[in-house]
Regions:
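Solvent-exposed loop/turn segments at secondary-structure junctions
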Residues: 46-49, 81-85, 127-131, 156-161, ...
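Helix-loop-strand module that forms the ligand-binding subsite of alpha/beta enzymes
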Residues: 87-174
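Short beta-strand elements in bilobed, periplasmic/extracellular small-molecule ligand-binding domains
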Residues: 75-76, 175-185
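Bacterial N-terminal signal peptides that target proteins for export
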Residues: 1-8
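C-terminal motif of bacterial Sec signal peptides marking the signal peptidase cleavage site
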Residues: 16-19
Length: 211
């Protein structure tokens, strides 16, 4: 009887450990299409006062990221800042510009996903002054992305991908950064689901990643 009770306790502990280690990565999208995903969508998105669509509760990039995950069956992970950016548009601009100028590496909230089993990473972010938000670099520098294929996508208000793909390629020469990234206006991502889906479909097809 003692042996059985001990075994049950050990099994429960193992189950709890496995559950806790996976809690930061949402695998619901991949489970709808296949049992194991070989790709993950990693994104940073900002909420609050937006340049073109007012106050938003779900970021523009988040909306695109979820479409990509649903269409590819990829797992999904959101990069969240330990110290949230201001909700005010002007205040957020001031903070983000200073981070860019200082090449800051903002702290990320929570644990990062283990990318070992993901050869493909869809990387999403808003284009802030021609570059990725500095917190995206924080994530990449803390993750092992050597040899991985990085597929960038971004939201913007007129500047497209800017220099983001080239900057990523230069900063992480050990990874395979795809220069043919997806760029979508934030207002489109926020207000036009059909156009967003169409743009994602076209991009995935160009990469040979459509289902």
């Amino acid at each position: 009887m003692k042996y059985i009770k001990g075994a049950l306790i050990m099994f429960s502990a193992i189950s709890l450990t496995v559950s806790c280690s996976d809690q930061s990565v949402d695998k619901s999208a991949s489970n709808e299409t296949k049992p194991e995903s070989k790709a993950i969508v990693v994104y940073f998105s900002h909420t609050g006062e937006n340049y073109s669509v007012g106050v938003i509760t779900e970021g523009n990039t988040a909306k695109v990221a979820k479409v990509i995950a649903a269409k590819t069956g990829a797992d999904i992970f959101e990069i969240k800042e330990a110290k949230p950016y201001p909700q005010s548009y002007d205040a957020c601009i001031d903070v983000a510009k200073k981070e860019l100028r200082d090449k800051a590496r903002p702290e990320i909230a929570g644990a990062l996903p283990d990318l070992t089993d993901y050869p493909v990473v869809y990387l999403g972010y808003p284009n802030w002054w021609g570059d990725c938000p500095m917190i995206v670099y924080s994530f990449l520098e803390k993750s092992n992305i050597a040899g991985k294929t990085i597929l960038p996508f971004c939201t913007h208000e007129g500047s497209g991908l800017g220099s983001t793909s080239k900057n990523l390629q230069k900063a992480f020469p050990g990874a395979k950064v795809e220069l043919n990234g997806l760029s979508l206006r934030g207002a489109t991502a926020q207000k036009d689901a059909a156009a967003t889906e169409q743009a994602v479909d076209k991009w995935l097809k160009s990469l040979g990643k459509e289902k």
